[in-house]
Amino acid sequence: MADLLKNLYGDTFFKQYCTALTTVIPSFDEDAFDKAVHTDEWEAMELKQRMKHLTQVTDQILPIKYTDKVATIIDIIGALRSQGVGDQNFIYTFLTDIIPLHGLQDIETSISAIEKITSFTSFEFAGRLFFVHHPDRMMNQMKIWARNTNPHVRRYASEGCRPRLPWGLQLKQFVLDPNPIIPVLELMMEDDSEYVRKSVANNLNDISKDHPEVVINLIKKWKDVSKNTNWILKHGARTLLKSGHPEALSLFG
């Protein structure tokens, strides 16, 4: 699967990406960029290696000042959208990794960047370090994003703080104590987007692996509030149900 995905970074991608870079960066040299990307090692690189390499090469052609980097990335996304590139585009996830690379010391600019970029390509992996370095600020922002009109931003409010996000950096503080997450999730317990509800359920399932009592208490509080809420709770308790947790089984009959 990873082998197939890495091949997404082929001629069609580079034509599309270089067109956007040419539009946004007046000094962009396509030949030099092509040589920087397609090193002797490129063909042997796996998916994650190619993405990391694209992050590094792209970063080198962006402005030095962090706020200017962010503005340029957002303009690049705009240029890609003008070509018809749709949102939640996996192959451009490498752009998100530039933000924590330079933005951990400028949390407000980074928060603004996350909100603007996460609709185009998910920030769930690149955003993890911000929870390590700025946990309180990020969790306060998650409460704001949980009420956002954009479902992609609302989803990030849940997905971004999952304690055990697969393939992502584990947020150990939330593995130890998930209570800061609960008020965020409760704001989305009746969300009208299935995309958001799935993320809330997955977050609860993460929590249940270390703190089943937290999820059980939430089920007792929210069960039968609505059909959507019941789906979130049952899907969020799936590991408990599969393992035969007595109280989870009794709650869902």
Regions found by a protein language model. Name each.
Residues 1-253:
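Surface-facing alpha-helical segments and adjacent helix-coil boundary elements at the starts of domains
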